[in-house]
């Protein structure tokens, strides 16, 4: 039986980029929570991460904003924002094209979904991943919901 982990976390750009301005106790508690979540994820020995995040106009725009979009790539680059502003270096995270194609094929049966073979990660994905898979080495399958 597959083992699945589900979790949620904040993606505010200042979590990394302005960490020095935070109350030390609050920052330490948040970073500890990210450490706990990373440990819980790694305890499942995951083959891939499925990330659901908001799209911050990095890949889609008002004249072409799908309700739902899924990434289907061999890799994803990020962050699209200034690395100094986020305090996250540029990275390339592996994707899982086969898993993405299988999920997209099933979802398309009931949901109007767009897929993208290129996707630049913005802070909404880059910030959590910088804590949860800091080497950016776990294959990612992304989905975007317009909320």
Features from the language model and the residues they span:
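General beta-strand structural signal in soluble alpha/beta enzymes
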Residues: 7, 51, 115-117, 143
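A short aromatic-anchored loop/beta-hairpin motif
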Residues: 1-106
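Conserved small/polar residues in nucleotide/adenosyl-binding loops
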Residues: 145-147
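Conserved ATP-utilizing enzyme core subdomain
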Residues: 109-140
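Generic structural hydrophobic/aromatic packing signal, biased to beta-strands
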Residues: 7-9, 103, 129, 140-143
């Amino acid at each position: 039986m597959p083992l699945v982990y589900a979790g949620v976390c904040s993606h505010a750009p200042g979590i990394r980029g302005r960490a020095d301005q935070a109350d030390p106790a609050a920052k330490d508690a948040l970073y500890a929570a990210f450490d706990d979540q990373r440990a819980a994820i790694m305890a499942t020995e995951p083959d891939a991460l499925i990330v659901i995040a908001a799209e911050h106009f990095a890949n889609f725009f008002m004249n072409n904003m799908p309700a739902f979009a899924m990434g289907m790539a061999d890799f994803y680059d990020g962050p699209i924002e200034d690395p100094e502003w986020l305090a996250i270096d540029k990275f390339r995270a592996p994707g899982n094209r086969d898993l993405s194609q299988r999920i997209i094929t099933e979802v398309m049966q009931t949901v109007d979904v767009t897929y993208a073979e290129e996707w630049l990660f913005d802070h909404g994905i880059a910030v959590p991943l910088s804590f949860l898979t800091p080497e950016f080495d776990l294959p990612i399958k992304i989905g975007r919901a317009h909320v």
